Amino acid sequence: TIDPDDRALLENNLAYQLASKPVEGDASWVRPGKISWEWWHSLNIYGVDFRSGVNTATYKYYIDFAAKYGIDYILLDEGWSVSTLNIKEPRREIDLGELIRHGREKGVGVVLWTLWNPMKKDLEGILDTYRDWGVKGIKIDFMQRSDQEMVRFYDEIARAAFDRGLIVDFHGSFKPAGLQRKYPNVLSFEGVYGMEHDKCSTDISPVHDCTLPFTRMVAGPMDYTPGIFVMDVAEVNPGNHSHVNATLANQLALYVTMYSPLQMAADLPEHYEKYMDAFRFIEDVALDWEESRYLLAEPGDYIVVARKAKDTGEWFVGGVTDENRRTVTLPFDYLDPGKEYVATLYADAPDADYQTNPQAYVIRTGKVRQRTELDVEMARGGGFAISIREATDADRKLCKLK
């Protein structure tokens, strides 16, 4: 059928519906979550009393950061093992057993980056080792193919990991085709020209962020690595003059507009703590959704999405725009009638701009109802995010959100 409303494409889940039914077995252990990621800033943390780098002290720092702010996992990306081909032996600078023990004590799981080729040669042996170590999952990388042999190998990886209680993030992958339905431990796929490329280029435009939900994301979850708060890469990698073409509020919105049950918190922990009031949204936002509503959308121009958290019933809204400043009028008709809600809005400041003033944002909290309509202005390359919960007696003095 042909639908005149572009939002209908966003609601399409045909790839998932046509996929194989879930395999038998207990999947209650599978936990979507946020993951602290060190690759973006190359482990260049500062203000600490140890030498940062690929070592035990640095990764303990990430575990402590994750535990403090409710982040579920940390990722040890490429470089943790003695080589990319020997992924059963950590570098001598890393006491992986101690990291896993420390993470378990703090409630933070450890996920390991792996190259696909050694997995192909010794899949069960490597995954047995990871299970015995206490690793929670793998990010497998550089497959870069979609021939029949590789497609079968994806299935083998997912099955072997499921049997051992490991989550999977397919990086360097082709777009998903429903494998996450068959194996619920498969949480995400790259299969996209994602934000990590901003580390070494400025190719990703605001238009890109407004186009992907209508193209790549229709196929399934997408590991886009959002959450950058400091847009000039030279801040963490001196001499690198790349720039993220987004405002800080836009980066918050991507946690809602870009669907993935596994979402990176990609920036430096110090950057998050510098903008702690904005980071609160990343702390709060859910990743496991009961319902999604596509409120406003025009391919390549803008998109506004509202999603309802599965466990809490709270709503989260995200909106992004292209290189044009625009104002959108938000409906709240998805909320229950007769109830009051408290909404916290994270929006671009009046002088925000993705090129000249990306860190300018405002935060406002107030009451909303099902019949509320709210005008929100987005800067060039900007956006907004909203968290919504039911009001309590303690909120009775709050004014209407404006």
Where does each model-flagged region fall?
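Conserved structural scaffold segments of CAZyme catalytic domains across common CAZy folds
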Residues: 1-105, 383
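Conserved, mostly hydrophobic/aromatic
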Residues: 66, 141, 168, 257, ...
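Aromatic- and carboxylate-enriched substrate-binding clefts and catalytic-loop regions
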Residues: 77-247
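Solvent-exposed beta-strand/loop surfaces of large extracellular or lumenal domains
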Residues: 141, 345-371
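Acidic/polar loop patches that form or flank catalytic/metal-binding clefts of enzymes
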Residues: 167-172, 263-272, 291-293, 329
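Glycan-recognition and catalytic regions of carbohydrate-active enzymes
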Residues: 270-316, 351-357
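Carbohydrate-binding surface patches
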Residues: 299-342, 384-387
